Amino acid sequence: MSEMSYLEKLLDGVEVEWLPLGEITKYEQPTKYLVKAKDYHDTYTIPVLTAGKTFILGYTNETHGIYQASKAPVIIFDDFTTANKWVDFDFKAKSSAMKMVTSCDDNKTLLKYVYYWLNTLPSEFAEGDHKRQWISNYSQKKIPIPCPDNPEKSLAIQSEIVRILDKFTALTAELTAELNMRKKQYNYYRDQLLSFKEGEVEWKTLGEIGKWYGGGTPSKNKIEFWENGSIPWISPKDMGRTLVDSSEDYITEEAVLHSSTKLIPANSIAIVVRSSILDKVLPSALIKVPATLNQDMKAVIPHENILVKYIYHMIGSRGSDILRAAKKTGGSVASIDSKKLFSFKIPVPNINEQQRIVEILDKFDTLTNSITEGLPREIELRQKQYEYYRDLLFSFPKPETVSN
């Protein structure tokens, strides 16, 4: 009997009661679990968590106020964005805008069943909305509880749903772990290929390798700069990818002609020069299309005898070195000193050697970063499969009184 057939047999003829989330769960504020230190390090042992995409911000050596999730797992819920994570290891919390959610009665409701159901809900996050979401909204949402009058059978159904979804998430986790291993391998070979001894090849400053462009923000008050825009306007939020051919925001030709931002030819390498992300990493990407930048970005078009892909790989390899050399000290937001950036030196071998290096690294790059090939594509397909079955498993008949 297939897993789905077994579940269908379990569900055959059962009643379902839709109960407010606040009735079957309880929450704790993270106040006594908040981290105090800011100097995170990979050699420390206690993770510092956020409910958002980053999840693990770093590791602390603090030993007091540790949430013991290894003994009793918990859902961490961001009270503003509604992002949530399942946690089954000990941790410290970063933000007070977080709820630690647990089940009121494990003999009636499995917390992981609640977690999987939570993730079937569409996001209701609105930019600029500072309303606390758990009490005002999510605690009132109704969750389907099968066989409410038969706790034993209810738990059996919940457990089976959790077991099936755990298998899907485990498959994705295995692929993600393999991808991370390959990325480390790629970074190692990239750094080896791009290492040259003094005197082996010519060294140039970043300012000498090509033409640099800055960015700007067209006036938000001029609708003609933004409405029906077709020109990518790239900002740090678009730099989660290493190859960029689209952006979240677009501007018009009118904006290019009459604002501080200028059109940059295709095949430039862009970097972030002002953002809190610079406290951790220097985001860089190959911009494959003509585009514009906001004021927190810079881009370079290499000179004719320098391959754009070589510079793309080189900046990716030297990112941490560039940050150490060029990041400004002080200031409320991390930023790059342009003078120090442009004076940073990199090795530039002859064009044939550049081509050889690029061909080798491009093959690795496809395996680790391509969303149409390799592991990233497989992970994306597994995630879609998981979401399909998750939504199917929670598709209980919904009464008219439930408006989730």
Swiss-Prot record:
Residues 154-199 are annotated as: Conserved region 1. CDD domains: RMtype1_S_Eco540ANI-TRD1-CR1_like, RMtype1_S_EcoR124I-TRD2-CR2_like. It comes from the Bacteria. GO terms for molecular function: DNA binding. InterPro entries: Restrct_endonuc_typeI_TRD (IPR000055), Restrct_endonuc_typeI_TRD_sf (IPR044946), Type-I_RE_S_subunit (IPR051212). Keywords: DNA-binding, Plasmid, Restriction system. GO terms for biological process: DNA restriction-modification system. Pfam families: Methylase_S. Residues 350-404 are annotated as: Conserved region 2. Residues 1-153 are annotated as: Target-recognition domain 1. Residues 200-349 are annotated as: Target-recognition domain 2. Contains two DNA recognition domains (TRD), each specifying recognition of one of the two defined components of the target sequence. Belongs to the type-I restriction system S methylase family. The specificity (S) subunit of a type I restriction enzyme; this subunit dictates DNA sequence specificity. The presence or absence of a 4-residue repeat changes the sequence specificity; a third copy of TAEL inserted at position 179-180 changes the recognition site from 5'-GAAN(6)RTCG-3' (for EcoR124I) to 5'-GAAN(7)RTCG-3' (for EcoR124II). Type I restriction and modification enzymes are complex, multifunctional systems which require ATP, S-adenosyl methionine and Mg(2+) as cofactors and, in addition to their endonucleolytic and methylase activities, are potent DNA-dependent ATPases. The presence or absence of a 4-amino acid repeat changes the sequence specificity; a third copy of TAEL inserted at position 179-180 changes the recognition site from 5'-GAAN(6)RTCG-3' (EcoR124I) to 5'-GAAN(7)RTCG-3' (EcoR124II). The shorter protein is also known as Type I specificity subunit S.EcoR124I. The type I restriction/modification system is composed of three polypeptides R, M and S; the restriction enzyme has stoichiometry R(2)M(2)S(1) while the methyltransferase is M(2)S(1). There is an equilibrium between R(2)M(2)S(1) and R(1)M(2)S(1); the latter is methylation and translocation proficient but restriction deficient. This is Type I restriction enzyme EcoR124I/EcoR124II specificity subunit. It comes from Escherichia coli. The lineage of its organism: Bacteria, Pseudomonadati, Pseudomonadota, Gammaproteobacteria, Enterobacterales. The gene is hsdS.
